[in-house]
């Protein structure tokens, strides 16, 4: 029997919520298939201090060896260069002690090292894009291209993006929309088979309507002062940058006029005043807005309280490659959605499954039409919606797709296998 050894590089921390939802579950699944994974991640000091032991416990009895590195935030640019230096050093330490068959690079900073290993040592690497990262930085107003430094950095990473795509052994895209965009670039050697689409999946054992305890649900409802006859709609996630709280609040106002017993349940770790101020601007009574910061274990229950959930994401070029995890989580709970078009594959997913309503513009007329269409879908067929989520975004399906990529690459390196 043989064990394949890989390095998985994430510039996101495992003590961050994203690492815990979008990295660790996949790696735990892959590690059960006789794969030893050396996981390198960059951890923010406070979160690492609070969550270190929790993450270490997750890896007990697995084939995952965690190599946490310190994330440096300041000064800009220089801090990132310092992180890359530490990353290269750690990778070299691992290579000295292990016969590595593959490097899996999550996003662009990681791929800088993966690309070098492919070029210098011939080690295969997966470019797991996660999105058009450089364009996201511009569209999200993080990089102002009027600043010459950011213009240089942007151009550098756009050139690297094409290099990673050509150089990698496999590309993982979150959406078919982004895959088609890449194919339209007509890069040398890039065809349909080189790009695997794996959307952001959800743990549908956790986000499951079957896992809801009715007594706990009633208790939570009472604690939030939500009445039995309240018409609850929810939003789950951040309130800044990409997520359009003002427009979501405008739609809720339209709903509250039509259904006076409406309440807007906002599940977020952000400051509640962001939501309350958005409501105040529209003269929506504060009593209609419920803002709740929740542990991951509570989120399925909060979604389950709602008739439907909404999310509006700022449309932009980079959002062709976006796969909102919240969509899979909400549908996993059997709850329909109202959302907007021009974000990854969201429109096709929602419309093909008849699991909600998609709007094309942000205005009162569109909101009224969307609400009428949603009300026509209610009461929702919760079981059908949950089953549809399993079809397109189950964690098990995502793990199997990654496993197929790994085994295809491993099979080309049969001479590099290390005996157990």
What are these regions (language model features)?
Residues 1-56, 60-64, 96-98, 170-172, ...:
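N-terminal subdomain of nucleotide-sugar transferases
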Residues 6-7, 227-243, 248-252:
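Conserved donor-binding/catalytic core segment of Leloir-type glycosyltransferases
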Residues 17, 243, 293-302, 309-331, ...:
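Nucleotide-sugar-dependent
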Residues 51-58, 208-226, 382:
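A short helix/loop element that forms part of the nucleotide-sugar donor recognition site in Leloir-type
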Residues 89-93, 112, 116-120, 133-135, ...:
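Membrane-proximal helix-turn-helix segments that form the acceptor-binding/catalytic region
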Residues 177, 201:
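Carbohydrate-associated surface elements
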Residues 267-268, 273-301:
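Nucleotide-activated donor-binding/catalytic signature segment of Leloir-type glycosyltransferases, i.e.
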Residues 361-366, 376-411:
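A charged, aromatic-enriched C-terminal amphipathic alpha-helix characteristic of glycosyltransferases
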């Amino acid at each position: 029997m043989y064990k394949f050894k890989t390095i998985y590089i994430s510039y996101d921390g495992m003590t961050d919520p994203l690492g815990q939802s979008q990295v660790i579950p996949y790696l735990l699944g892959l590690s059960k298939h006789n794969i030893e994974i050396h996981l390198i991640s960059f951890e923010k000091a406070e979160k690492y201090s609070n969550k270190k032991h929790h993450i270490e416990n997750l890896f007990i009895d697995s084939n995952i060896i965690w190599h946490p590195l310190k994330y440096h935030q300041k000064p800009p640019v220089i801090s990132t260069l310092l992180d890359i230096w530490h990353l290269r050093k750690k990778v070299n330490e691992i290579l000295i002690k292990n016969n590595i068959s593959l490097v899996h690079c999550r996003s662009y900073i990681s791929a800088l090292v993966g690309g070098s290993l492919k070029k210098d040592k011939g080690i295969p690497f997966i470019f797991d894009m996660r999105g058009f990262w450089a364009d996201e930085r511009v569209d999200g107003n993080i990089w102002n291209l009027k600043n010459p430094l950011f213009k240089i950095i942007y151009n550098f990473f756009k050139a690297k993006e094409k290099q990673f795509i050509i150089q990698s052994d496999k590309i993982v895209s979150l959406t078919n929309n982004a895959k088609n965009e890449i194919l339209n670039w007509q890069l040398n050697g890039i065809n349909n088979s080189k790009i695997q689409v794996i959307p952001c999946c959800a743990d549908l054992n956790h986000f499951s309507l079957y896992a809801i305890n009715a007594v706990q649900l009633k208790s939570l409802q009472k604690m939030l002062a939500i009445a039995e006859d309240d018409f609850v709609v929810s939003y789950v996630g951040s309130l800044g940058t990409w997520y359009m709280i003002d427009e979501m609040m405008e739609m809720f106002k339209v709903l509250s006029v039509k259904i006076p017993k409406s309440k807007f349940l906002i599940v977020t770790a952000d400051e509640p005043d962001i939501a309350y101020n958005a409501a105040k601007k529209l003269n929506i009574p504060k009593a209609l807005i419920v803002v709740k910061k929740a542990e991951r274990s509570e989120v399925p229950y909060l979604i389950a309280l709602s008739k439907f959930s909404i999310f509006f994401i700022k449309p932009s070029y980079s959002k062709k490659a976006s796969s909102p995890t919240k969509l899979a989580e909400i549908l996993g709970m059997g709850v329909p959605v109202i959302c907007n078009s021009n974000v990854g594959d969201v429109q096709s997913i929602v419309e093909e499954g008849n699991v909600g309503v998609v709007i094309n513009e942000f205005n009162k007329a569109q909101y009224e039409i969307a609400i009428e269409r949603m009300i026509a879908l209610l009461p929702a067929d919760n079981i059908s919606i949950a089953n549809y989520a399993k079809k397109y975004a189950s964690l098990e399906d995502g793990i199997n797709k990654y496993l197929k990529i790994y085994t295809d690459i491993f099979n080309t390196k049969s001479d590099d296998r290390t005996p157990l």
